[in-house]
Every structure is written in structure tokens, then in C-alpha cells.
Amino acid sequence: MDYILIGVILGIVQGISEWIPISSKTQVLIVSSSLLGLSFSVAYSFGLFMEIGTIAAAIIYFRREISGLLKALVRMSSRREDYLLLKFLVIVTIITGLMGVPLYLFVISLPILGLPMTVLGVVLLTDGIIIYLSRKNYISRKGLHDLRLRDIIIVGIAQGLAALPGVSRSGITTSALILLGVKPEEAFKLSFISLIPAALGAIGVTVLFSKHEVSQAVHSVSLSGLLISIVVATFVSIFFINALLRFARTNKVVVLVIILGIIAIISGILSGIAKGFY
């Protein structure tokens, strides 16, 4: 198959799956394994590296919030919200790193341990059930200023679990925030902004510990194919961020969250029965 077409396909898969409750890592892993024949560890590392496009999209879409964060970082902001968001991101990112790095090192050793690939489908299905239950029972009342240290730590732990293949980062962090009583629109927004430092850290860890796998993945898809996939992922991501946040502002948010929960459950079932993958 043409590498440019592969790049476009991977970019679309990454751009869509990052923001809805299906694991983008797992979807890219499945597609890249099917189209390129990559091994588990190489495909998994490639999936993390693909997040460059979604990081770019989040920075572009939330540029005002990023500007406020930078001002708060050097104590030049006059807005309390900027300092609260900075505190939130710092704590969440630290907890995510403490959870995520050991999990990542464990995951890339899975083929060595001989664990079956069916674990991906099981984890995805469990993730989907958690997402569905959390959205069914939430009471939306909180904003960023209402979150306590304990709440922020819980969000960090949830995001750290997303290092596991099959676990949706946006799905599990949004679910955690909604379970804590955060308003849906605020929960989506905080989850999406939290992606930026978490994904940057994930890419850094991937390059540090999996240089060979990343190099092999880039060679398999070609540098031009990789760049195309990142650009496509960026544009698709911007569209989906905007669509989800706009929908979350409406009184039809229950429809949105139920649909996202169903998508996660179906994704888990399909991954679990994809016999050609494992």
C-alpha cells in the first residue's frame, strides 16, 4: 500500500480516536500492525509517537489557555483561573508520570512475558463500562476552582492508567472528572488540556526507552508518511475537539456521553474478537 495513503489513514485514526473513549494507542496499534506488519512493541511505540499531531491540535485550539498558563508560570497573569489551571496541570502531570512510566515499561515487555494480545480487548471493554457508568450517575456542579488536592490526584492516577494499551486517556480522565462532580464541558476541557504535558512526556519516554522501535516504525511508514499522518491527525483533532466541546455546552450532553460510552463498549468487543490481531 502507498505510504502516503497509510499516513493519511493513520492520521485520521489518531485524530478521531484521541478525543473519544476508545484508546488511540490501541487503534493505531491495530491499524499499523495490519497495514505494516509491525510487532506489538514497535506498533505501540509508534502509537505514542503519533500523538505529536494531537498535541499540536490541543495547543492550537487552547492557545488562550496556554498563553495564560505561560503568564502564570512567570507570575505575570492577573487571572486566578490561570494559576488554578497551572496547579492542576502540574499535579496531574506529576502523578501521571509516576503511574505511567512504570506501566509503559511493563507494557513494552509484554511480548517477552508472553501475555496474550486479548488483554487489549478486555481492558477496552472494562474501560467502556466504567465510562458508561460514570456518565450515567454524575451530578454536574463543580468547576476547576472547586477541585481539591485529592480530586486532582485522582485525575492524575486515572490519566496514568492510560499508559496501558486499550485504556482511553480522554475517556478515563473525563470519566474521573465527571465522577468527581465536574460539569461536562469543564471535564472535557480539562481532559483535553491535560493531554499536552502528558503526551509530551509519553513521547519523551518513548524516545528514551524505545529508540529502536521508533526508528523501525518510522522506517516502515517512511518519514514522509509519518509527517503526513501527523498533519492529518492535527486537522482532524481540531475538528473533533471543537465538535465535542460545542456538544458538551448544550442540554443534549446526556446523548453525547451515552453515545461515547456505547462507542467505548463496542470498541472493546470488536478489539476482543479481532482474531487476526492476536
UniProtKB/Swiss-Prot annotation:
It is an enzyme of class 3 (hydrolase). InterPro entries: UppP. One of its GO terms (molecular function) is undecaprenyl-diphosphatase activity. GO terms for cellular component: plasma membrane. Keywords: Cell membrane, Hydrolase, Membrane, Transmembrane, Transmembrane helix. The chain crosses the membrane at residues 3-23, 42-62, 88-108, 112-132, 152-172, 190-210, 225-245, 253-273. Its EC number is 3.6.1.27. It is found in: Cell membrane. It catalyses: di-trans,octa-cis-undecaprenyl diphosphate + H2O = di-trans,octa-cis-undecaprenyl phosphate + phosphate + H(+). It is a multi-pass membrane protein. It comes from the Archaea. Catalyzes the dephosphorylation of undecaprenyl diphosphate (UPP). PANTHER family: UNDECAPRENYL-DIPHOSPHATASE. NCBIfam families: PRK00281.3-5. Belongs to the UppP family. This is Undecaprenyl-diphosphatase. It comes from Saccharolobus islandicus (strain M.14.25 / Kamchatka #1). The lineage of its organism: Archaea, Thermoproteota, Thermoprotei, Sulfolobales, Sulfolobaceae. The gene is uppP.
